[in-house]
């Protein structure tokens, strides 16, 4: 962490980056060095989502986005330096069009739900073939955290979503077990 702090503690960055943003940058950089690629990718996804939405908001209100982008990955650097509509990301961020639509949402609760749905889809896409792996357990935990967050806001909907999740997991585990049996019985 010391190297990350030193790299960020240049005179020009000292003037603009708040301590909260420095801490966030350290958090994401540390998390993205995790030995588990899935976990590292999850944190990078969150960093990228936050940075893209921040850049869109900065553009909308005339702020210099370079002062608000956190982290030093390739996407963060592209966002800081590009004036293109897509921040020079082109096809490298497959969820960029969806994020641009989300950024246009004026209702903050709807916007947050759409962000969580984007993350949920990413979790599903990245654990589809990993039924019995630790990645699926981590994804399950992350989904439960999302549900818990929304249950406090809308109890009836949260309970319904939770029941749907449990039902889907039961169905998925039954299917996986049947497939496992078919493949291993000779």
Task: Describe the predicted segments one by one.
Residues 8-18:
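Terminal low-complexity "docking" segments
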Residues 1-5:
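Short, small-residue-biased leader/transition segments that mark boundaries at the very start
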Residues 16-184:
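A contiguous, surface-oriented mixed alpha/beta subdomain in the mid-to-C-terminal portion of proteins
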């Amino acid at each position: 962490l010391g190297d990350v702090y030193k790299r960020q503690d240049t005179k020009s960055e000292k003037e603009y980056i708040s301590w909260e943003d420095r801490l966030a940058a350290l958090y994401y950089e540390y998390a993205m060095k995790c030995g588990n690629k899935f976990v590292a990718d999850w944190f990078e996804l969150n960093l990228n989502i936050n940075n893209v939405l921040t850049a869109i908001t900065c553009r909308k209100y005339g702020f210099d986005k370079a002062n608000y982008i956190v982290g030093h990955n390739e996407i963060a650097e592209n966002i800081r330096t590009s004036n293109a509509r897509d921040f020079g990301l082109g096809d490298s961020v497959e969820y960029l069009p969806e994020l641009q639509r989300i950024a246009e949402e004026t209702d903050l609760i709807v916007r947050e739900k759409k962000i969580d749905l984007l993350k949920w889809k990413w979790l599903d896409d990245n654990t589809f073939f990993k039924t019995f792996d630790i990645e699926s357990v981590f994804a399950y935990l992350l989904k439960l955290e999302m549900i818990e967050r929304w249950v406090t806001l809308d109890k009836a909907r949260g309970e319904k979503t939770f029941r749907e999740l449990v039902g889907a997991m039961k169905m998925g585990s039954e299917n996986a077990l049947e497939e496992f049996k078919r493949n291993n019985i000779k």
